[in-house]
């Protein structure tokens, strides 16, 4: 009879030494991001990166509601206002300069969207939390001034979330897809024919081909080209001018890059991820007119701070609605 010492034994080595091992994407082109700017020595749930027409970067922290404004040239950080709504999750900028802020509310039924100036003045409810049951996480404008938003509700076995389109006059809300589990990131292709959506707690990437009206799905047009692995799942996303999609992986300290057909073609790693640091990567965004990508993450779980990281992407960022 073999002793316990003689038995085949598993050892931590190679990928199994990592807190967040990469298995299925290990052969992809892989680069490691460089630190760009420390937002706080405290762990803040950073999200919502977006640049205005003057090249100023706006972002927020979800749990405390701070809205930050950063000058990329000087790296000066300002806090122009604090969200009056609970748990803001994304900022998008209208071509008229207003900030549209998505908020999650109580994470059940009191989310919405409000608009404000860059200083937090002239508040306007766009989607009111009192008259809806949404938990709004993110949005993307089309060239007509309407927008798509994600409903962040549900969980893996109770898919209550979905994606909706709001008309340019903000009066009509049309469902695009429903019954998905925590709809999160959303991006629109350069020709506005394809809508990308990440489904966080089901670890899926949706590719939705749209008719010219922007709300009707083409025959067989709603597909799932990719299933992610690991904890927690895909988060916010953006596109470049070649229609590549950049998806932040929350809880994994990395960004995955897909081509316009949904095939993975590259990945960006956050330093320290193998040791369990800076895993809460939430949002990638391009500096306008460049291929320089900014990524936000934080180290709440390990008692660390909140950082922005940077790399160069495959192509320049797409000039979206606020620049048109």
UniProtKB/Swiss-Prot annotation:
Positions the record marks as coiled coil are none
Q: Which UniProt keywords apply?
A: Calcium, Cytoplasm, Hydrolase, Metal-binding
**SUPFAM superfamilies on file:** Calcium-dependent phosphotriesterase
Q: Quick one: effect of changing residue 47 to A?
A: Loss of activity
Regarding pH, the record states: Optimum pH is about 6.0.
Molecular function via GO: hydrolase activity; metal ion binding
Q: What is the effect of changing residue 235 to A?
A: Loss of activity
Sites where the protein binds Ca(2+) 1: 47, 137, 184, 235-236
Provide the E.C. number(s) assigned to this enzyme. 3.1.1.-
The record gives the effect of mutating residue 184 to D as:
Decrease in lactonase activity
Tell me what effect the entry lists for residue 47 to S: Loss of activity
Reported effect, residue 237 to A = Increase in lactonase activity
What organism is this sequence from?
Staphylococcus aureus (strain Mu50 / ATCC 700699)
Could you identify this protein by its name? Lactonase drp35
Q: In UniProt terms, what is the effect of altering residue 184 to S?
A: Loss of activity
């Amino acid at each position: 009879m073999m002793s316990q010492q003689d038995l085949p034994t598993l050892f931590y080595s190679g990928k199994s030494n990592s807190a967040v091992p990469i298995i299925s994407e290990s052969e992809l082109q892989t680069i490691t991001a460089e630190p760009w700017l420390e937002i706080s020595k405290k762990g803040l749930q950073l999200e919502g990166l977006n640049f205005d027409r003057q090249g100023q970067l706006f972002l927020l922290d979800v749990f405390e509601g701070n809205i930050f404004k950063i000058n990329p040239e000087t790296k000066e950080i300002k806090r122009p206002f604090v969200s009056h709504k609970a748990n803001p999750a994304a900022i998008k900028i209208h071509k008229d300069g207003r900030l549209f802020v998505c908020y999650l509310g109580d994470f059940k039924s009191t989310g919405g969207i409000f608009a404000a100036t860059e200083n937090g003045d002239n508040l306007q409810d766009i989607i009111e939390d009192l008259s809806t049951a949404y938990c709004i996480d993110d949005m993307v404008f089309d060239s007509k001034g309407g927008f798509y938003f994600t409903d962040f509700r549900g969980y893996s076995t109770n898919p209550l979330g979905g994606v909706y389109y709001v008309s340019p006059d903000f009066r009509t809300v049309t469902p695009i897809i429903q019954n998905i589990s925590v709809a999160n990131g959303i991006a629109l292709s350069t020709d506005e024919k394809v809508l990308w959506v990440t489904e966080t707690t089901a670890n899926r990437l949706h590719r939705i081909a749209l008719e010219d009206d922007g709300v009707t799905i083409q025959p067989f047009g709603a597909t799932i080209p990719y299933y992610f692995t690991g904890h927690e799942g895909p988060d916010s996303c953006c596109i470049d001018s070649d229609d590549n999609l950049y998806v932040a992986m929350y809880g994994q300290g990395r960004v995955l890059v897909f081509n316009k057909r949904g095939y993975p073609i590259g990945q960006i790693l956050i330093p320290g991820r193998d040791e369990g640091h800076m895993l809460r990567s939430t949002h990638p965004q391009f500096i306008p007119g460049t291929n320089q990508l900014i990524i936000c993450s934080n180290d709440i779980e390990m008692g660390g701070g909140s950082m922005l990281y940077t790399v160069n992407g495959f192509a320049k960022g797409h000039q979206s609605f606020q620049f048109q």
